[in-house]
Amino acid sequence: MPVTKHDAMKAYFEPKVIELVGDLLSFNFSPESPDSIAFVTNYSDKVLKKYIRIGAEKEYGFSIIITKAYSTSADDLNLEAMNFAQAFMDWVDEQDRKKDYPDFPDHCQIKKIENLQNMPNLAGINAKEGLARYMLQCRVVYFEKER
């Protein structure tokens, strides 16, 4: 079983990343290489609602950064990249519908995993290298028992 929430999140996303791009998930680092996917932490244990002597509803925020080839031509490369990133968002939504969640520590019960937007952001381009970064912002909402 993973030791921390960070371990759980990496273990949760890594099989999907390997399936999609045949490479490991980068953690808190987004490489300048096409077809790379990074997991970037935003915040953890943010309290949404506190229950005295019971625990708290909390959230774990993160971003998925997808680096794809970028084109300044009138081809469909950028559209294909956007559709790839959108499909990753759709996969996150599907996992929530199936209630297939990361394996957080025993004192935590996940309520949902969700995208915080309805489409990926074009987070930046490197025209010289022909790369674009697409960002998906997400969160896990969970209940953590007081220990």
Summary of predicted features, one role per range:
Residues 32-50:
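Amphipathic, interaction-prone secondary-structure segments
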Residues 1-28, 46-147:
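Charged, amphipathic alpha-helical segments and their flanking helix caps
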